[in-house]
Amino acid sequence: MELNQSDPEYINAMTLHLTGDWATAQSALEQLLKKYPDNPLIYFLLGNNSYSQGKLDTAIDQYRRSIYLKPDFGNAYYKLGVCQYRVGKLQHALESFQKVATLKNQSHAMAIYFAGLIDVLLGNDAAAAEAFDSFRKVSPESHIANFYLAQLKLKRNEFKDALDPLAQLAAETPHFAEVHYMLGVAHYGLHENMEAIKCFRRALEINPNDQRSKTRLALLTDTPWS
């Protein structure tokens, strides 16, 4: 039987969950499942309820059941990935987030972000850079994603590609010394030495103890910086 979202029992279960009465909501959802057996939405809601109580392994099983019943359930894949990430099952989480991105009309920007983050942790630099590139297109204002993207570009000696996210970060977080240092590294890699000097000096203005910027400036200006 298809779930009737006007059903008073469904409305009551949702009200209990949304008001934080998770134990009672659990019982209400389990009763609702007897009325609407094998309903993917109810299993999804049970997963959400378990997640809210910190029962991550239980939530994982419930999201998996929801996906089994509805293989294109993008939100269930996303929440499954979040749970797997939180319990340290990074490879499984990565697969769940990647699945979200393949489902038509269910692309979830945060799934791309998490996929990039996991790839960073797993050392998959190329895949991580691709993920953060994609995320930047839909959420260009994310400072954390832009920072990771810039780090990856510098690590891969893709200095020109690092300039844009770093310039944006420098404009939006002007007192973040690390960003100015990284921007200096990018300019240095492109042999734009005058711009690099400006960036390293700015990094030192913010953080006078930055030995990396001092070393770079000494190399560029033949002047010891202390």
Which residues make up each language-model segment?
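Register position in tetratricopeptide repeats
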Residues: 18-19, 52-53, 86-87, 121, ...
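Alpha-helical segment of the N-proximal tetratricopeptide repeat
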Residues: 5-41, 45-52
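Structural marker of alpha-solenoid helical repeat scaffolds
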Residues: 35, 69, 103-104, 138, ...
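Start-of-helix register in tetratricopeptide repeats
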Residues: 7, 41, 75, 109-110, ...
